[in-house]
Amino acid sequence: MAIERTFSMIKPDATKRNLTGAITKMLEDAGLRVVASKRVWMSRREAEGFYAVHKDRPFFGELVEGMTSGPTVVQVLEGEGAILKNREIMGATNPANADEGTIRKVHALSIGENSVHGSDAPETAAQEIKYWFSDTEVVG
């Protein structure tokens, strides 16, 4: 499997509970390396832009409200098969369906407050990384 990069986000429901370190440790323990990281407080415009793919979905307003309710940690992760590995360690979107030991099973509060986001494909990883980071901020 090839070394690749993916985008990862620790959402406000997790940062408010001081889980940034615990979640990052789970990612690193899974063999992923953080090559860029910053803490941001998303504006409404940033949240709407980042989640534009969901703009016509019924949960969009609630999603934007949640993402602008507190600080978020955005990261670029690197490793073998990083996209799939990150998705596996995050667990199912609904924490009730997540496997034991995954981030969402351990830390998520609900399907809406599920603690993390991760890219689902190489194309979205590239777009999401570019949305939050300049080339000089990603240091492998």
UniProtKB/Swiss-Prot annotation:
It is found in: Cytoplasm. It catalyses: a 2'-deoxyribonucleoside 5'-diphosphate + ATP = a 2'-deoxyribonucleoside 5'-triphosphate + ADP; a ribonucleoside 5'-diphosphate + ATP = a ribonucleoside 5'-triphosphate + ADP. Keywords: ATP-binding, Cytoplasm, Kinase, Magnesium, Metal-binding, Nucleotide metabolism, Nucleotide-binding, Phosphoprotein, Transferase. Its EC number is 2.7.4.6. It is an enzyme of class 2 (transferase). The keyword Ribonucleoprotein does not apply. The keyword Thylakoid does not apply. GO terms for biological process: CTP biosynthetic process; GTP biosynthetic process; UTP biosynthetic process. The active site is at H117. Gene3D superfamilies: Nucleoside diphosphate kinase-like domain (3.30.70.141). Major role in the synthesis of nucleoside triphosphates other than ATP. The ATP gamma phosphate is transferred to the NDP beta phosphate via a ping-pong mechanism, using a phosphorylated active-site intermediate. NCBIfam families: PRK00668.1. Belongs to the NDK family. This is Nucleoside diphosphate kinase. It comes from Rhizobium leguminosarum bv. trifolii (strain WSM2304). The lineage of its organism: Bacteria, Pseudomonadati, Pseudomonadota, Alphaproteobacteria, Hyphomicrobiales.
